[in-house]
């Protein structure tokens, strides 16, 4: 597991350590300046030879990560979710299992869960980059990004109130 760090990086390292308490081997990629999600992955891509799962740390879900796979010939696979209140317009459409940039209908929101091929980052010389704008969108335009819609439990935790609301709802179960 690679954890990309900037804000409170030392505290996270001190808390998680090498991961052995959790049955993991954790490596850290420290950013002195924010590189963006794509830049953070690009900065640590040397750790990966095979496709890997990228998961935003501000999400909570019961999505089964074991079910993720990358179709032969594709550079990425994105998990989409129904649009939340803060993104009613959605991000992208899904057409025949591919991320569709042309369609204006039935757009969904990118969950922050994906499986990525290291090849997605091969041609890049960028240092600061966004995963969507600089890597996934150009690949999707070439038909190289598949996707799926997940309609199960999913929360994007953008604020302390979001975390408190989730904690309260989980306490009720």
Where are the language model's segments positioned?
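Short glycine-rich loop/turn motifs that provide flexible caps or phosphate-binding loops at active sites
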Residues: 8, 16, 35-39, 111, ...
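Conserved beta-loop-beta/alpha segment of the NTase-like Rossmann-fold superfamily
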Residues: 13-14, 19-90, 94-96
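Short, surface-exposed alpha-helical segments at coil->helix boundaries
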Residues: 9-13, 133
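Short beta-strand/loop segment that forms part of the nucleotide-sugar
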Residues: 1-7, 29
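Hydrophobic/aromatic beta-strand patches that form the interior of the parallel beta-sheet core
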Residues: 2, 53, 77-78, 146-148, ...
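Structured beta->alpha junctions
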Residues: 5, 32-33, 105
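Catalytic-core segments of class I nucleotidyltransferases/pyrophosphorylases
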Residues: 60, 65-70, 83-86, 98-173
